[in-house]
Amino acid sequence: MRVAVVAMETSQYRDTVGRTRLERVATELAAAGHDVTVFCSQWWPGFDNQRERDGITYRAVTVSPTVPSFCVRLPVMLARFRPDVVHVHPTPASVALAAKTGATLSRAPLLTEWFGDENVPENRRAGLALQASDCLITPSELVRTRVRERGATADQTAILPQSIDMDLVSEVDAGEEIDVVYAHRLDGSANVESLLLGLAELRQKGWSATIIGDGPERAHYEQEAADLRIDDRVTFAGACDTEERVSIYKGAHVFVQTAFRECFATDLLWAMACGCIGIVEYQAESSAHELIEQRDRAFRVTNPQEIADKITESAGFERRTVDESCAEFDHAQVRARYEDLYEKQIEDAGLF
């Protein structure tokens, strides 16, 4: 299958979860034998107009992210590539519309990867780009609902989750045994207060906790742990790479999710795959609760006292280091769902 991915600004220009997700999908598809080309602004040095990396061809539409020039050149370049499917990042909306023109010239369906962190403006051009997409892919029901509220139809949307590496989960050694782990960038949406207040309720019990992540609010949270007199049992591990996180998760018994905003709770998923019991504090702007709806080793809570209660209750569950029920989220399984979606869209496009 020939797949054209369109992202004027790749993660080399602007590192966001949505861009990284689209690029990871491209990498997975290329590894599975598909012909994948990313049409983007040039991010590599030199004068070559394309670059090969991880089995993907990156083709420069423009030297820098210049919207007018990019939009003029993109449709013809897509038509010459003759893709079976075009997969686009939703911003800028003008680029998404240009991708639609190229897809139409190629007689290929246009799919839009709408992760939820793109900050798409609510204007006429963005609305046209949304309506022009044959399928809008979101990571969760929360984001799907937001897209529907902007005018997308139910048939026009699909939910495909973030993916994880179950082989890595199996291979990495478990870290030191701890009771509770939390992971999120320590910013204004982290809401570590709920966890710390819950832990403070258990001050008289023996427990240990690790907080993974760094950010502008780290000093504030460290001071709060000290004010609650639990800083001797809370370790702030800072930013950790994926392998380090997996090791910590495999040594932990409970993962507590309290962040105010999550398009998809990826760290919660990794932790549950590593055997952790999931405790999710419901937040209106977070999709985390969606991950635990059908799971036995998980609890949904609404306040710090309930967090404390469920941490205590979790002591009655056995410790695990791998949960094979999360295999449905493995990279290969999610990639197969993208392939199925592509094939369906190609088939539907061929009917008209």
Name the predicted role of every residue range.
Residues T104, L110-T138, Y249:
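A conserved, positively charged/aromatic
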